[in-house]
Amino acid sequence: MTADLATATAAKEDGLYVYCVARGGGHHVLGPIGLDGQVVYTVGSGNIRAVVHSCPAEPYQSPDARVVEGWVVAHENVVRAATQAFGTVLPMAFDMIVRGGSGGGAVAALKAWMEERCDRLARRLDRLAGRAEYAVQVFWDRQEVAAWLVQGDEALRRMRDEAGS
């Protein structure tokens, strides 16, 4: 899909799903890497660009937790792809959708939002430069951790021994 076709598609939809914001302008197509395989592209305003896909102006919802998990993973994968393509990005929360308004469609609303916040977005991108976001999950067995703690602490061993008698 060309940048012009992506923009034309956005004009027909009433919403834009926003993954992140990065520096730079112009239109770039990242390809069909978005939620449900949507084509992801950028919408630029000045020296700021938003990484988006066209969508209906309503939240993504599913009663199936696996579907929602897939969407969240796809969202994160797009943010990573944008980071590789554009450098520092300011990630948006899952399911951030810009709707068109009385002044035009979703593209016009998004550009107006970026223009109003251009300086603030640039400062946030500057603060994030050279940093990365990580998620850490820790899984542990309570009994093993308790035994390890007791083994290394005399006071805990005494309390364990007193409680057992």
Which residues does each PLM region occupy?
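An interfacial alpha-helical scaffold signature
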Residues: T2-S165
